[in-house]
Amino acid sequence: MSISSKIRPTPRKPSRMATDHSFKMKNFYADPFAISSISLAIVSWVIAIGGSISSASTNESFPRFTWWGIVYQFLIICSLMLFYCFDLVDHYRIFITTSIAVAFVYNTNSATNLVYADGPKKAAASAGVILLSIINLIWILYYGGDNASPTNRWIDSFSIKGIRPSPLENSLHRARRRGNRNTTPYQNNVYNDAIRDSGYATQFDGYPQQQPSHTNYVSSTALAGFENTQPNTSEAVNLHLNTLQQRINSASNAKETNDNSNNQTNTNIGNTFDTDFSNGNTETTMGDTLGLYSDIGDDNFIYKAKALYPYDADDDDAYEISFEQNEILQVSDIEGRWWKARRANGETGIIPSNYVQLIDGPEEMHR
């Protein structure tokens, strides 16, 4: 059996976390910014519509296009409330921003026509559209910015649900991780590490030794192997292994001839790199690697981390795991940008380190 068949990862079960977009008023009540801004918008809209009706009912001339601006603003307010209740604000941010920008133009145009007109009733209507223009400008700043922007983070910090996850940061994070993925097969790493530790590396001068191109995920070389499991590299890997086997055997034979005292040691080293990987030592190492996420003991998860934001695992990566905000995770390796972790339900895999925070004691779990 070749090594490529032994390191093929077992597919992970689909994530159990599903996003609920059912109608819930608590989604609206849990956001202070939504309640305060929409409430002010409703009050301003009532002032504008009241002043407009009073002004139009008299003999005073009233700009007719203002009626459409007031109706359009009402549709925007109702749409915002529905987006919050269905928890779809992040899905329609571009639509919300552009729609509010149009309403801002309508209201500022109406304010220009009403401010310089005569009559107290028109003054009330102009005050309403001016307030709506100010609120629309604040909405454009908030909904037009990413959730990772300083203003949005400060506003969302008052929300009961906490800071919203940033789609932009998430996309950049995954793109950076894909770009830094190691292109060296796991088999090469096993051989390179063993040759370097056994002292044979100096005997093969001129023979190219590929090295891992990154250590972004975890400190162990086992995880680097999981990032490259394409079957189209198996032929090149087998050719490399056979060539390396011949070189190691040659070096081992030369070592036996020159120094009989090291005969047993060199024989063990040569047998370790069997082409079919039938040796017990190598089999044990691969078994430990395959059990990296499934059979790891409780003692290895010596850290605890609290999730700062919710995270949805990438469907293309079988070793990412999803988690909820404020969820407590057990972590076994805290080096690099990706940590090995386990959820309370036993699901194990890797998590982005910038989405969690290490905690020291039980008192920090409830903060």
Swiss-Prot record:
Q: Give start-end positions of Low complexity composition bias.
A: 259-272
> What job does the chain carry out?
Plasma membrane osmosensor that activates the high osmolarity glycerol (HOG) MAPK signaling pathway in response to high osmolarity. Detects changes in external osmolarity and activates PBS2 through the stimulation of STE11 and targets PBS2 to the plasma membrane. PBS2 activation leads to changes in glycerol production that helps to balance the intracellular and external osmotic pressures. Activates also HOG1 in response to heat stress and mediates resistance to oxidative stress. Involved in the regulation of the mating pathway. May be a receptor that feeds into the pseudohyphal growth pathway.
Q: Carbohydrate attachment sites? A: 59
Q: Where is the SH3 domain?
A: 300-361
Q: What is the name listed in the Swiss-Prot or TrEMBL entry for this protein?
A: High osmolarity signaling protein SHO1
Q: What is its main location?
A: membrane
Residues with Phosphoserine modification:
166
Lineage of origin: Eukaryota, Fungi, Dikarya, Ascomycota, Saccharomycotina
Q: Name one GO biological process term.
A: regulation of actin filament polymerization
Task: Enumerate the Cytoplasmic topological stretches.
Answer: 1-32, 87-93, 144-367
Q: Which Gene3D superfamilies match?
A: SH3 Domains
Q: Name one Pfam family in it.
A: SH3_1
**Gene (UniProt):** SHO1
Region named Disordered = 252-276
Instruction: Please report the record's description of how this protein sits within the membrane.
Output: Multi-pass membrane protein
Q: Does the keyword Transmembrane apply?
A: yes
Q: Where are the transmembrane segments?
A: 33-53, 66-86, 94-114, 123-143
Record-linked SMART domains: SH3
What does the annotation say about its assembly with partners? Forms homooligomers. Interacts (via the SH3 domain) with PBS2. Interacts with FUS1, STE11, STE50 and RNA polymerase II.
Record-linked PANTHER family = FCH AND DOUBLE SH3 DOMAINS PROTEIN, HIGH OSMOLARITY SIGNALING PROTEIN SHO1
Q: Which domain of life is it from?
A: Eukaryota
Q: Which family does it belong to?
A: Belongs to the SHO1 family.
Where would you find this protein in the cell? Answer: Cell membrane; Bud; Bud neck; Cell projection
Per UniProt, the keywords (alphabetical) are: Cell membrane, Cell projection, Glycoprotein, Membrane, Phosphoprotein, SH3 domain, Stress response, Transmembrane, Transmembrane helix
Any Gene Ontology CC annotation:
plasma membrane
- Give the intrachain disulfide bonds: none
Segments in the Extracellular topological domain: 54-65, 115-122
Q: What organism is this sequence from? A: Saccharomyces cerevisiae (strain AWRI1631) (Baker's yeast)
